[in-house]
C-alpha cells in the first residue's frame, strides 16, 4: 500500500510515534480543527478528488470508533473529547460510500463492554 493513499480523518490526539510516522510517510491528515473550519463535506470531497486524481479503484475503508466524540460513542477504550459528531460521521461515511470504490471495510476500537449508555455506539 502506498502511504500517500492513506487518509486520516478526525485526528485530535497524536503521540510522538504517530506524528513521526505521519511526517515520514507523508500521510494525509484531516484534523478536527480542519473539520470545524472547513466542514466534513470539504474533507470528503478533497479525499474523493485525490482518489480520482490518483486513479485509485479499490479502497479499504477502516472506521475507527474513537474518531467519534465519546459523548456519542462511549463504546471505545480510547476516548478523546471533541471528536466527530454523529451527523458528521454519517455524512462522511455516505460521501465515501458514494464513490463506489469501497471494496472492504472494518470497524476498529469498538468495545461493547464500555457501551453502557443504551448501546449508543452500536446504534451509530
Language-model features and meaning:
Residues 1-16:
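Mid-sequence, gly/pro-rich, charge-dense loop/helix-turn segments that line enzyme active sites
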Residues 21-23, 28-124:
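Catalytic cores of soluble, metal-dependent hydrolases
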Amino acid at each position: 500500500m502506498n502511504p500517500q493513499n492513506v487518509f486520516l480523518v478526525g485526528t485530535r490526539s497524536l503521540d510522538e510515534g504517530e506524528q513521526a510516522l505521519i511526517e515520514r510517510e507523508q500521510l494525509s491528515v484531516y484534523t478536527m480543527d480542519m473539520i470545524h473550519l472547513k466542514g466534513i463535506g470539504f474533507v470528503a470531497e478533497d479525499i474523493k478528488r485525490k482518489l480520482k486524481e490518483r486513479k485509485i479503484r479499490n479502497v479499504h475503508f477502516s472506521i475507527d470508533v474513537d474518531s467519534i466524540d465519546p459523548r456519542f460513542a462511549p463504546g471505545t477504550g480510547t476516548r478523546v473529547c471533541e471528536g466527530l459528531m454523529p451527523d458528521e460521521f454519517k455524512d462522511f461515511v455516505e460521501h465515501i460510500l458514494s464513490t463506489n470504490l469501497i471494496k472492504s471495510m472494518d470497524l476498529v476500537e469498538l468495545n461493547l463492554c464500555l457501551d453502557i449508555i443504551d448501546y449508543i455506539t452500536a446504534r451509530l
